[in-house]
Each structure stands twice: as C-alpha cells, then as structure tokens.
Amino acid sequence: YLHNIAGIPSDKPVLIAANHPTAFVDPIALCIYLDPPIYNMTRGDIFQRPWARKMLEDVNMFPVFRMRDGYTGRERNDGVFEFCQSKLVKKQVVAVYVEGEHHLDKQVKPVQKGLSRIAFGTYQNHAPEDLQIIPVGSNYIYGDRTRDELKLLVGAPIFVKDYWEAYQLNPATAINRLN
C-alpha cells in the first residue's frame, strides 16, 4: 500500500525522515517506490570490508558512525554531514533513518538528532530556502517474513526555514522542536 509517493519533489533539496522497521528492506523500498534517486545513510561498520563498501556506494548508501557502535565523538560524522550538505545543495534527496536503529516494534523509537543537525547545518552554510524534511513511514504486517505487505506513507513537507529563527536563538531547543 502506497500513500502520497509522488510527494517527494525532484527539484528541491529533501531530507527524508524515515523510520526503520527492517534492516535492509527499508532503504530498498524507498529507492524502488520513490523518485528521484535517494542517498541512504547506513550503519558505518558494514563499510569496513572493501567489497561491501563498493557495493553499498554503488547503490547510493553512505556510512554514518554511531557512538553506541564504539565510535567516539561526533567529529567522526563531520564528513558524513558535509556529504549530505553537498547532495542537498545539488537538490538531491538524502534519507536518514531517524531512530538510529531498526526494530519491528509497532511504534516509533526516540528520534536521534542527526537529521536536525544536517538540516540546520545545510541551511546555515548554504541557505537553501526550499530545504525540506519529508517524513516517510514504513510499516509491515509482520516484518520478519518474506513477501510481507508494506505500507509506505509519505507525509507533508516540513520547511527548515520555519525553524531557523528559533535555531539562531537557541540551537538545542530548535533541534528538539524539529525532531
């Protein structure tokens, strides 16, 4: 079941804020059902093997490094955030799995702050007035079975410029509001 899948513009910078009920199917589903091409943020440790890195990069996946996986400090992701900004400035689509993990629970886990940091960093460094965040929800009947039914829901855009003034006054509060 697909809802509003035409809601992703191809002529504007878009951050997709997606949930992540399954490990590998979610990014594939987004790439199959949504246009334009999507760059997917992916757990960094799976890029350590050269053959895996090549395969993942060929399908527009790029690494992100989580502290809970043993990576220290946010500076490891500075290059990741710059990569995202470079794609957004070119009016491309970047998908961030905002819960920071996959799970089969039928509820959304707490949203991590990476998406907001990417959005505000892009706006601060490049000021794209049309930068938007589009929520995308994936839900499966079971999630752990092959040939399961997928419901893919594309929500209304959230414009980063609407949060910019709040970010300038208090970045932490604006990040929490945007999340």
State where each predicted segment sits.
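Soluble catalytic domains of membrane acyltransferases
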Residues: 1-173
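A conserved active-site cap/scaffold subdomain adjacent to cofactor or substrate pockets
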Residues: 176-179
